[in-house]
Amino acid sequence: MTSMTPQEIVSELDKHIVGQSSAKRAVAIALRNRWRRQQVQGSLRQEITPKNILMIGPTGVGKTEIARRLAKLADAPFIKVEATKFTEVGYVGKDVDSIIRDLADMAVKQTRESEMKKVRARAEDAAEDRILDVLIPPPRGADGAEPAADGTTRQMFRKKLREGLLDDKDIEIDVTESRPHLEIMGPQGMEEMTEQLRSMFSQFGQDKRRTRKLKIAEAMKLLTDEEAGKLVNEEEIKTRALANAEQNGIVFIDEIDKVATRQETSGADVSRQGVQRDLLPLVEGTTVSTKYGMIKTDHILFIASGAFHLSRPSDLIPELQGRFPIRVELESLSVQDFEAILTQTHASLVKQYQALLATEDVTLAFVPQGITRLACIAFEVNERTENIGARRLSTVMERLLDEVSFDATRLSGQTVTIDEGYVDQRLQQLSLNEDLSRYIL
C-alpha cells in the first residue's frame, strides 16, 4: 500500500491530467485514508470503512485516466471494469461477483511478482549455476572437491555470462514444460466448481521436463523464472494476496450511468436495475467465493464514474446512491486546458509524435502559436459537433500530421515547423465545414 501524502498523489496526477482538481483531491484523500486506517490500532480499524466515490463528468475529461494513473500509484490490488459488461443473475453474461474474483487474481499476481523480486538475486545465481553445469560439466568420478583449474574456468565463464558475452550462443537445457491453458465453460453460478475442475486437470503432466535448444540469454530468463518459482511459497502468496485484496483493494467501475435508468423506461432496463441490485451487496459488504478462498468486500474501495448524459445520479437506485457518499463533478475542458494537455503533460501527444517521427530522422518543431491554434480548432469542433473532450485532440493531431507521417521517409533529415499557418492550411476548411468535421475530425 502506498504511503504517499495527498499532496504527492495530486502532484503525480498533475503530470498526466490537466485540471479536475476536485476529483484528484477526492481520490488522493481516499487513497491516503487507506494508509491511515492501517495505522489505527485495535477493533476500531474494522469499523472504519472506505468512503466510495462517484465521479460525474462528460466523456474525455479525465475520469478513466485518473483511474489508470491511480492504479500505478496505489501499489495495491486494483481493477477497472465496465458496468455495461455485467448482467443481472439469471441473464446471459458476466455476474458482478466476477469483479471480486478478478480482483483476487490481480492480487495474487501482484503478490507473486513482489515475492519473485525478493528472491531474484538467488534465482539468478541458481540459473547461472545450471547454465555453467551445461557449459562446463563437472568431471566424472569427482569426489565433490572441485579442481582448482576447473574452478578458475568456471569463474571465467561466469564473468563472461554476467557481462553478456555469451548471450548469443546456443545451449541445450532441461526445463519444466509449461502447462497448457485449459478453458472449461461452466453454467452461471457454478464458477467455483469450474475453477476446481480447471485446477484438477491442469495438474496432469505439470512436472514433465523436456530439453530445449535456446540462446543463453533466453535460457537465463527461463531458468531464473523457474528457480524463483521454486523459492516462493505459493500458499503463503495466496493467503497474503487475499488479505491485501480485502484490506487495500480498489475497484473502479466505469460507465455506471449506462445501468442507471429513468423511471419511465421499461423492458430491457429490468436487467440494468438488476445489475444495480447485484452491485449493492458488493459495495456495502459481502463475502465472495474465489478459487483462492473467501473475500470480504467490506473494506474494498469502490470508485464509480459516468457521463450521465441521458440519466442523472438520482436515477440510480437509492440504496446504491447512498453507498457513494463522495461525489465529484469533472468540468468540461477549455481551450487553455487543451493547450496544457498538448504542452504540459508528461507524455503529451506532441512529445509522442515527435518521438515517433524522430525514428525516421524527421524533426517536428511545434511553435506556441501553432499549438494555440490547434487547441482552438479542437475546442471549436467539440462545440459544434459531439463534445468528446481531450479525445478530439488525437483526431485533430492525426489529421494535421497525416501528410508528414506518410512522407516521413522522403522528409528524412528535415525539420517540419508546425505554426499557425501550417495548422490553418490543413485544418481550417475542415473545421469550418460542419459536415466534414463531423465525419473526419
Swiss-Prot record:
Q: Which UniProt keywords apply?
A: ATP-binding, Chaperone, Cytoplasm, Nucleotide-binding, Stress response
User: Does the entry feature the keyword Transferase, yes or no?
Assistant: no
Question: Where does the UniProt entry say this protein principally localizes?
Answer: cytoplasm
Q: Which InterPro entries match?
A: AAA+_ATPase, ATP-dep_Clp_protease_ClpX, ATPase_AAA_core, Clp_ATPase_C, HslU, P-loop_NTPase
Which SUPFAM superfamilies does the UniProt record give? P-loop containing nucleoside triphosphate hydrolases
Organism superkingdom:
Bacteria
Q: Which SMART domains match?
A: AAA (SM00382), ClpB_D2-small (SM01086)
GO MF entries: ATP binding; ATP hydrolysis activity; peptidase activity; proteasome-activating activity
The GO cellular component terms are: HslUV protease complex
Q: Where does the protein end up?
A: Cytoplasm
- GO BP: protein unfolding; proteolysis involved in protein catabolic process
> Where, by residue number, does ATP bind?
V18, G60, V61, G62, K63, T64, E65, D254, E319, R391
Q: What does this protein do?
A: ATPase subunit of a proteasome-like degradation complex; this subunit has chaperone activity. The binding of ATP and its subsequent hydrolysis by HslU are essential for unfolding of protein substrates subsequently hydrolyzed by HslV. HslU recognizes the N-terminal part of its protein substrates and unfolds these before they are guided to HslV for hydrolysis.
So what family is this one in?
Belongs to the ClpX chaperone family. HslU subfamily.
How does it associate, per the subunit comment?
Answer: A double ring-shaped homohexamer of HslV is capped on each side by a ring-shaped HslU homohexamer. The assembly of the HslU/HslV complex is dependent on binding of ATP.
Cite the NCBIfam families for this sequence. Answer: hslU, PRK05201.1
> What name has this protein been given in UniProt?
ATP-dependent protease ATPase subunit HslU
Q: Which organism is it from?
A: Verminephrobacter eiseniae (strain EF01-2)
- Tell me what gene encodes this: hslU
